[in-house]
Amino acid sequence: MAKEKFERNKPHVNVGTIGHVDHGKTTLTAALTRVCSEVWGGAAVAFDGIDNAPEERERGITIATSHVEYDSPIRHYAHVDCPGHADYVKNMITGAAQMDGAILVCGSTDGPMPQTREHILLSRQVGVPYIVVFLNKADLLAEDCGGVDSEEYAEMMELVEMELRELLDTYEFPGDDTPIIAGSALMALNGEDENELGTTAVKKLVEALDSYIPEPERAIDQPFLMPVEDVFSISGRGTVVTGRVERGIVKVGEELEIVGIRDTTKTTCTGVEMFRKLLDEGRAGENVGVLLRGTKRDDVERGQVLSKPGSVTPHTTFQSEIYVLSKDEGGRHTPFFKGYRPQFYFRTTDVTGACELPEGVEMVMPGDNVQMTVTLIAPIAMEEGLRFAIREGGRTVGAGVVAKIIA
């Protein structure tokens, strides 16, 4: 069968399900594909097709993730669901599947549980910008309380909702403005809709995704940034730096900054080449060579970035969320302690840094995730949300994300 052509007529938004084990993330994922395919076209994916998530390797870390897609009237959604808690931790920290927004699934019969809290914290740390809540298993709660019209049901729902809004506030998400939809993913998956808890609730959830999660800014519309991979000097022409444009556009004649490792310097782009052809501009996703005026071969090095002036700044100290590879993943066999000084691999280069563990944490075991403050020996062009690998002698032992810049 011929591959279907991917239609680019709708904006593309990346989402995913998060929440405590057995609260119904995978059931809701399957229900979303079923309801959307029936109402707005596309293909439904069965629960088993999502639950048997294939393992992927991202930066040497094994992560089990399921990817499904569905359409709303105005958008195309790519949705990621993970089978186990550890997979969520790894996925969110490595940015293997970056989310423009998350669907927090919480069982209304249980209310918020430890992983509910942990996934909200992780979303904050790794920069998931928006959360929409689905209060699942509303049919079971209604059964326990004597029906959806009973006072007890209304009180219980209100209580769980209040707890969730407070929890979101704790981690600096706007609890009061967050859309919360109650329903039953299982009913929706089975095509039932008693008391509008099934299909209708899932439709309401999709409407909330459409209205509450803004369309993400495309990489090409963001300020120009290109990590420097290599530097050449071409006699009579000057210095050329090569790399893959991470975001934005660089045009011939534009002023640029060289940021990181040393003091920030200014330069001008006098040419862009790709495959030995001269271009007027280089765009996000392209591998290009940028010719720089007045910049000497020794003024630039791998690990720096070329960027739009003022758009990114160099820093050395930051708070991060880290996942430490387990022994089975080829990581360390032993824990590390405070004073640990590995290399931090940002974009194209390693920089040594010292780790400060949170209060009360004596050591970090392989397979753990932990918040820590890192101080690098050289500044790196950095923003919150930037991903990095932790290495020892060229071997990856962890992955992390910049949660907050300190200095």
Swiss-Prot record:
Coiled coil: none annotated. It comes from the Bacteria. Residues 184-186 are annotated as: G5. SUPFAM superfamilies: EF-Tu/eEF-1alpha/eIF2-gamma C-terminal domain (SSF50465), P-loop containing nucleoside triphosphate hydrolases (SSF52540), Translation proteins (SSF50447). GO terms for molecular function: GTP binding; GTPase activity; guanosine tetraphosphate binding; translation elongation factor activity. It is found in: Cytoplasm. GTP binds at residues 19-26, 81-85, 136-139. Residues 60-64 are annotated as: G2. InterPro entries: EF-Tu_GTP-bd (IPR041709), EF-Tu_GTPase (IPR050055), EFTu-like_2 (IPR004161), EFTU_2 (IPR033720), G_TR_CS (IPR031157), P-loop_NTPase (IPR027417), Small_GTP-bd (IPR005225), T_Tr_GTP-bd_dom (IPR000795). Disulfide bonds: none annotated. Its EC number is 3.6.5.3. Residues 10-217 form the tr-type G domain. Residues 19-26 are annotated as: G1. It holds the Pfam family GTP_EFTU. Mg(2+) binds at residue 26. It catalyses: GTP + H2O = GDP + phosphate + H(+). Residues 81-84 are annotated as: G3. One of its GO terms (cellular component) is cytosol. Keywords: Cytoplasm, Elongation factor, GTP-binding, Hydrolase, Magnesium, Metal-binding, Nucleotide-binding, Protein biosynthesis. GTP hydrolase that promotes the GTP-dependent binding of aminoacyl-tRNA to the A-site of ribosomes during protein biosynthesis. Belongs to the TRAFAC class translation factor GTPase superfamily. Classic translation factor GTPase family. EF-Tu/EF-1A subfamily. NCBIfam families: EF-Tu, PRK00049.1, PRK12735.1, PRK12736.1, small_GTP. This is Elongation factor Tu. It comes from Saccharophagus degradans (strain 2-40 / ATCC 43961 / DSM 17024).
